[in-house]
Swiss-Prot record:
This is Arginine--tRNA ligase. Belongs to the class-I aminoacyl-tRNA synthetase family. It is found in: Cytoplasm. Its EC number is 6.1.1.19. The gene is argS. GO terms for cellular component: cytoplasm. GO terms for molecular function: arginine-tRNA ligase activity; ATP binding. The lineage of its organism: Bacteria, Pseudomonadati, Chlorobiota, Chlorobiia, Chlorobiales.
């Protein structure tokens, strides 16, 4: 609704001789007696106007010039809010817009010509995907979907962590299990990867090579074999959740020198050094964040010669700027909270515009059954495996449950609830609303000859009851919900919104006879139902869940 009110409020401000660059807020009052929408613009610009907010609100109301049939009443409330009451026909026109635009309802071209990159999942290829990584994957996928509705050219990227100490430990783990297959007695280190999948990779190598690799200390063949198997497994798991990536960035490329040029990591060190932010002591190389007011410097290259996570992360982001992205969204787990501010500080020092970098941190996931914490793992080590969760509750429930709480909140994933075929299950509740409308349309086609193809919403202005207006009002919010979800990188807002739409539709369905109504009213209510179905479908597409036509 901001798009509707904004030009009229700006026009009133101009008539009043008030210039401001402050963002005009349009909100929905919790209590409908305060109108359908309200704005606090009088508070925001009272100082510039040299008037108290209530007096200014009254002046602005006199200057607002809305088209006939849209706003029925405008009033000053409290210390200076401006409340707007809309005509029922205005809400119904929004439902007509849904039918006219179809899949395009809620979309715009605000991001046209802009390139965005969303990096998500980026799990180390050291084992099967865990549930925690799955939450980040769904979050990132939904954010990418939201960006596409706004016209951005979106690249979905997986930062492939194929370098560093953990990959060496993976290779050593496979080698130890391989040597066991060769008949050697091995004391397997507790610090290494314990899952059954390590033994399975070793078994494959033994079948292919016999004991021919037993005498070598070279880890490359073990690393490459493990990496190929595990990464293939990761991609298959993600595909089950309809999570895809357009590009895979190999971390090892940040360590490589090219055509006589230093590696990307080394270029970061050199550039920070030139700015006076590199220190060398205790055998390590440090990012001197004490110069930025921090208590301690942060290590970039350890005394072992291995880089910390910060160095390749900084170098990786430099490549994003070099690739010309206008917006860079990074989806991380909570373990990155402490590290990432240092990456942004380094980028600022290097002269990059960090306002283009957005961070979405998602908290941990705990699976519960009957209120008790459980491990979703059948055999592959002590881990909560994403595949096992999908096997148990399905892809739709997995996706929706991951994002039905805010990303900043720890998620208790109730496995029993996710499997319920009742309105208590949020997934069932949403999908049932869609299936109910599909069933209604089929019945209308059969019983009264309703033709969905000719439904353009011409009869919608007939509708004026409270359930009908409330339902149409909810549809009107869809474009704003997309914008809000994107600004906050929070798909949970879309989940909550769709629940409201479904809830209002179920109420409308119960209180407003449809097939038994007279012809014109029946057609109008069927058209409103079609508009609801379209909004649900558009929302489901953003969330990546299916829209069943029967349940």
């Amino acid at each position: 609704m901001r798009a509707f009110f904004l030009p009229f409020i700006q026009d009133a401000l101009q008539k009043a001789g008030i210039e401001t660059d402050k963002e005009i807020q349009i909100d929905k009052p919790n209590d409908k007696k305060f109108g359908d929408f309200s704005t606090n613009i009088a508070f925001l610009v009272a100082k510039e106007a040299r008037k108290n907010p209530r007096e200014l609100a009254g002046q602005l109301i006199g200057l607002l010039d809305f088209p006939e049939g849209t706003v029925t009443k405008t009033e000053v409330a409290g210390p200076g809010f401006i409340n707007f009451h809309l005509a029922p026909a205005f809400f119904m026109r929004s439902a007509q817009e849904v039918l006219a635009k179809g899949e395009g309802f809620g979309c715009n071209e605000s991001g046209k010509g802009l390139k965005a990159i969303v990096e998500y999942v980026s799990a180390n290829p050291t084992g099967p995907l865990t549930i925690g990584r799955g939450r980040g994957g769904v979050l990132g996928d939904c954010i990418a979907n939201l960006l596409e509705t706004q016209g951005y050219e979106v690249t979905r990227e997986y930062y492939f962590n194929d370098a560093g100490r953990q990959m060496q430990i993976l290779a050593e783990s496979v080698r130890y299990r391989y040597l066991e297959k060769c008949g050697q007695v091995i004391e397997f280190p507790e610090t290494h990867y314990q899952g059954d999948y390590i033994g399975e990779i070793a078994e494959t190598l033994f079948i292919e090579h016999g004991d021919g690799l037993a005498a070598t200390d070279e880890l490359t063949i073990f690393k490459e074999a493990a990496e190929a198997v595990i990464f293939s497994s990761i991609r298959k798991t993600l595909e089950r959740l309809l999570i895809t990536h357009d590009s895979f960035f190999n971390e090892h490329t940040l360590y490589q020198s090219r055509e006589g040029q230093p590696s990307a990591n080394q270029r970061v060190i050199d550039a920070l050094d030139a700015k006076g932010f590199i220190g060398n002591y205790d055998g390590a190389t440090w990012f001197m964040t004490t110069k930025l007011g921090q208590e301690k410097d942060k290590v970039l290259i350890k005394s072992s010669g291995d880089p910390s996570y910060r160095l390749p992360d900084i170098a990786y982001h430099v490549t994003k700027f070099e690739r010309g992205f206008d917006l860079m969204v990074n989806v991380f787990g909570a373990d990155h909270i402490d590290e990432y501010p240092d990456v942004l500080e380094a980028l600022k020092i290097l002269g990059y515009d960090t306002s283009k970098v957005k961070i979405a941190i998602n908290q941990f996931v705990t699976t519960t059954v009957g209120g008790q914490t459980v491990k979703m793992s059948t055999r592959k080590g002590n881990a909560d495996l994403l595949d096992d969760l999908i096997d148990d509750v399905g892809a739709d429930a997995t996706r929706l449950f991951f994002i039905m709480r805010g990303k900043d909140s720890h998620l208790n994933f109730d496995v029993e609830l996710a499997k319920k075929q009742s309105k208590d299950n949020p997934v069932f509740y949403l999908q049932y609303a869609h299936a109910r409308i599909c069933s209604l349309v089929r019945m209308a086609e059969k019983e009264v000859g309703f033709d969905e193809a000719t439904a353009i919403g011409a009869g919608l202005p007939l509708l004026s009851s409270e359930p009908e207006i409330d339902l149409a009002s909810a549809l009107l919010d869809f474009p704003d919900i997309i914008q809000s979800s994107l600004r906050q990188l929070e798909p949970q807002k879309m989940v909550e919104y769709l629940h409201t739409v479904a809830e209002r539709y179920h109420k409308f369905y119960q209180e407003c006879p449809i097939l038994k109504a007279d012809e014109h009213l029946r057609t109008a209510r069927l058209e409103l139902s079609l508009a609801v179905r379209q909004v649900l479908r558009n929302g489901f597409k953003i969330l990546g869940i299916s829209a069943p036509e029967s349940m």
